[in-house]
A protein has these predicted regions:
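Membrane-interface loop-to-helix entry segments
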Residues: 12, 150-204, 258-263, 399-402, ...
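Extracellular loop-to-transmembrane helix junctions
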Residues: 28-34, 53-150, 154, 261-264, ...
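TM-loop-TM module centered on a large, flexible mid-protein loop between adjacent transmembrane helices
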Residues: 100-103, 107, 140-144, 259-322, ...
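A generic transmembrane alpha-helix motif of multi-pass inner-membrane proteins
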Residues: 199, 396-414, 420-476
Length: 476
């Protein structure tokens, strides 16, 4: 096996085990390439493409060209980062992809804090957001209020239900991921193809790209806000690496899944935005708000189709929530199996019947529920101080992309056997992309970004105390 220098030669014994055999930690090789691709595509393509489209247009003052540029910029950053991680995935396999790569690059300490952040902030904020949004679209579909307690309880039921499936039926969770991914692509491909054809015929597509906005020149920060907003629509692809210890032939299949999945997502997003231009003017798109998918498909295929597409959207959101929960359910396990975090032996246990870390899954359900309460009562309804009302679906990208940078630098330093393109050019481009994303987040949110960082520091300090306590116990 080709190895890096001292840092990247840390592959554990699990990397050499034959396919189909259980790892020493007990997790089974249960997933194949299509499940991994479905993780990437299915997690990324969810609610974001539907409910962030109007926000992107609004930030760009209705300019479709700039909106498409937004989609392309964030997509390019995702592609470059996924290619770099695909390179890492072909060389290192242990328990939880991104945490494994952090450990290989910078040691156990850095890996611990990455895993702590992913487990307590990144996974659960996305899960809670998607559960709430899924309930919102279900409310639009079935006609119940989308801001009241009915909405709240449906979202919570979706969250807990997904968690229980992942805890007690992990194979079913994988099958759901594959099936919902196939279903969610149907409306997007239809809009991309039919919408573009209709738009070129009725002139709306040409109009969307030629009509100049009167406000563009006076609002230079619009693109930054649009980039941060649409970053959510691309988020979650890294979670596919959380199943690498359960993926058959992971060193071959995970790189393929990351690369192919990312390409599929970017192509579909770009085509979907172009397709939207054939259904209505950009001003009407912005005015439609969360009802944009229903109105766009209604204009294209008739009012009945507008209703049917909401069924697809709800299924799409359910699939994304499931994929995110697959990562959240394994967060505490990725710490416990390294003898790190809270009660490591308890969370490292794997159920012999299901081959799943059930205790870890329950921890994920509880943390996701706490974040769901925050999302509903603090962020949506503002029932807290202003410094604790930052947007949880967008701001964690600051620390996520910042965490990638040291890993990419380590790759450049230690990957001596790699060709210059993989060793220097791709990681450098990825670092620049990460820095750009962090800058955009600060430019768009300013004081709210600082509030989030304050919270992040507190969570990391708690993690430091937990790690210090564990280390002292180990020495006794």
């Amino acid at each position: 096996m080709k190895k890096y220098g001292t840092s990247y030669g840390m592959a554990c014994d699990n990397s050499f085990r034959k396919e189909g055999t259980p790892l020493e930690n007990g997790m089974q090789k249960r997933y194949g390439l299509f499940t991994a691709i479905s993780m990437v595509v299915g997690i990324v393509i969810g609610s974001g493409i539907f409910f962030k489209a109007t926000k992107v247009l609004a930030n760009n003052n209705g300019d479709m060209g700039r909106s498409l540029l937004t989609v392309a910029i964030v997509g390019a950053i995702m592609l470059i980062c996924s290619f770099v991680f695909a390179n890492l995935a072909s060389r290192y396999e242990k328990v939880n992809g991104v945490v494994d790569y952090a450990e290989a690059a910078l040691g156990r300490g850095y890996a611990y804090y990455v895993a702590w952040f992913m487990t307590l902030i990144y996974y659960p904020t996305l899960v809670s957001c998607l559960a709430w949004i899924t309930a919102q679209y279900a409310g639009i579909l079935f006609g119940f209020p989308i801001t009241g307690m009915t909405h709240f309880w449906i979202g919570l039921a979706i969250l807990v239900g997904d968690g229980l499936i992942n805890a007690y039926a992990p194979k079913l969770a994988g099958k759901l991921q594959v099936s919902t991914t196939a279903i969610k692509l149907v409306p997007l491909v239809l809009m991309a193809v039919v919408g573009t054809i209709v738009g070129l015929s009725n002139g709306l597509t040409v109009q969307a790209f030629t009509a100049a906005s009167q406000q563009i020149a006076s609002q230079g920060s619009g693109l930054m806000g649009a980039i941060v907003a649409f970053a959510f629509a691309y988020e979650g692809w890294i979670i596919a690496t959380s199943i690498n210890s359960e993926l058959k032939d992971a060193k071959k299949n995970l790189p393929l899944a990351l690369s192919l999945g990312a390409l599929i997502v970017v192509a579909i997003y770009m085509a979907y935005f172009v397709g939207l231009t054939g259904t209505m003017t950009t001003a009407d798109m912005m005015a439609a708000g969360d009802l944009l998918p229903e109105k766009a498909f209604g204009n294209l295929f008739g009012s009945a189709a507008g209703t049917v597409v909401f069924v697809f959207i709800v299924i799409s959101c359910l699939g994304t929530t499931n994929g995110l929960m697959m990562g959240a359910a394994r967060g505490a396990y990725s710490l416990g199996v390294r003898n790190e975090g809270i009660a490591p032996r308890f969370f490292a246990k794997v159920d012999q019947k299901t081959g799943m870390a059930t205790n870890s899954a329950w921890f994920g359900i509880i943390i996701c529920t706490l974040w769901y309460l925050y999302w509903h009562f603090f962020f949506i309804h503002g029932m807290g101080p202003s410094f604790f009302n930052w947007e949880p679906d967008e701001l964690p990208i600051i620390t996520l992309y910042a965490a990638y940078i040291p890993m990419f630098i380590s790759l450049m330093v230690n990957a001596r056997e790699e060709k210059p393109f993989k060793r220097f050019i791709l990681p450098t481009a990825a670092i620049l992309g990460c820095c750009f994303m962090v800058y955009c987040a600060f430019a768009a949110y300013r004081i709210q970004a600082l509030y989030y960082l304050g919270f992040f520091v507190v969570v990391m300090l708690i993690g430091a105390v937990v790690r210090s306590t564990n280390n002292k116990k180990a020495k006794v």
